[in-house]
Amino acid sequence: MTYSIGIDFGTGSGRVFLVNTENGEIIGQYVQTYAHGTIEGELNGHKLPQSYALQNANDYMEVIETGIPEILAKTNIDAKDIVGIGIDFTSSTVIFVDDQMEPMHNNPKFYNNPHAYVKLWKHHGAQAEADLLFNTAIEEKNRWLGYYGFNVSSEWMIPKIMEVNDKAPEVMTETADIMEAGDWIVNRLTGENVRSNCGLGFKSFWESSTGFHYDLFDKVDDNLSDIVRTKVEAPIVSIGESVGTVSAEMAHKLGLSPETVVSPFIIDAHSSLLGIGAEKDKEMTMVMGTSTCHLMLNKEQHKVPGISGSVKGAIIPDLYAYEAGQTAVGDLFEYVANQSPYEYVKTAEDRGISIFELLNEKASQRYPGESGLIALDWHNGNRSVLSDSNLKGSLFGLSLQTKHEDIYRAYMEATAFGTKMIMQQYQGWQMEVERVFACGGIPKKNHLLMEIYANVLNKKITVIDSEYAPAIGAAILGAICGGAHPNFSSAIQAMKEPVLYQVEPDHAQVLIYKKLFNAYKELHDLLGYKKARIMRNVSALM
């Protein structure tokens, strides 16, 4: 019997899973919240711009160096039976390191410099740089832009590199390598300085056939091409291939066999497709957490406006993987729950339930359209299909009779409407959606939300019984690289997570939600396209 380790680095915590390669059984698991969390608002007592979201890379290593030995000690598994390790990571989470692969923030002279720290995926400090890239690409009629949704996100790697070069050249000068944090973890485990085709292809303007888009970089900044060539370029390893084995030093430190094979990192949401078994084209998967990623597989490559990229073989060999997303979903629900009136909080405490359970109970008693509310779910900007991090959320239709559960339900509906915008975008560009999957802690716990999604999308929703699909997907990659399975299909079918429940659309509610969606779409187009300057001007005052 053999085992694989899946290491999942999420936004707020890291998880280590030991999984049976024959049947996907979770033998052991370890979860650790990052000690420094997400660094927002201030850094070491110094105020940060509102758009900043940073992390400390030492927290990531703490997850590995504590988690793996603890699991091995608790399970008594022979390390020689662990054939592979897979890693998934949020993206684009970018790290800047010196020539010893030490994060720049560990250098004492950069301790208070925010640009020496890891730039988390939701760091939006590079919007000006993203705009410059986009405008230059439009002027140059750059052919690649269509494969990135005809836009450039401040969340991607190249704008973040430009931001550091512009605002902290002293950090850039001493930086030896720039990479996705997932690639850095692979380096720490193996000693190999490589790049995953998944991270580069989706977030870094790199194509397998042509490499980086240096023709564009040259037009944007005189130094950008040189920075990418000397600090980003490295050998590429594709998903399904092996980077190598765990280094002797790390094997000794973690208690692993030096023969354990390591997979290249995969983006966390993408790993979920493997974990839930969505391996075919025409299937849309919603990976729902603090944000939501909407992933599609297709045999062909299409230029779909508003998506975040399309890369061949980034999840499943020979299939193009497409990514779109919403930047605030779980975060948005938590925001609304935190605004709950005192009497609601007190009632929940007295009944021994969470505030979310109380709000869901109350919201479920309301009928679609009953409150007269429509919300725009842009509290953290809009990733798809508008690709504008400067946009802000809105709530329309408030009256003196509006209750807090009405607001809560309106925001749940808004995230469903945002998902429908994305689904229609896929469908409008020759990508049929036949099945819809949902995974993550939110759909597992919130049946009402999935009912709303089924009725808004007018699709059956299949919810997977797993809060940790990314970790299982990473373990599947470890099993493939370690030789436990001959191919992707074999590994996925053996190790995937089971179905928890399915929700069918209700015809009567589908009809009501069509009308509400039309209202949402009109507001979306007005404030996202035609009158977007209104929100941008207000945001500029913050």
Swiss-Prot record:
The EC number(s) this enzyme carries: 2.7.1.16
Catalytic activity: D-ribulose + ATP = D-ribulose 5-phosphate + ADP + H(+); L-ribulose + ATP = L-ribulose 5-phosphate + ADP + H(+)
Family label: Belongs to the ribulokinase family.
A molecular-function term among this protein's GO annotations: ribulokinase activity
A Gene Ontology cellular-component term: cytoplasm
GO BP terms: L-arabinose catabolic process to xylulose 5-phosphate
Pathway: Carbohydrate degradation; L-arabinose degradation via L-ribulose; D-xylulose 5-phosphate from L-arabinose (bacterial route): step 2/3
Keyword Lipid biosynthesis: no
Pfam families linked to this entry: FGGY_C, FGGY_N
Organism: Staphylococcus saprophyticus subsp. saprophyticus (strain ATCC 15305 / DSM 20229 / NCIMB 8711 / NCTC 7292 / S-41)
Protein name from the UniProt record: Ribulokinase 2
Gene3D superfamilies named in the record: 1.20.58.2240, 3.30.420.40
Record keywords: Arabinose catabolism, ATP-binding, Carbohydrate metabolism, Kinase, Nucleotide-binding, Transferase
Alphabetized PANTHER family for the sequence: FGGY CARBOHYDRATE KINASE DOMAIN-CONTAINING PROTEIN, RIBULOKINASE
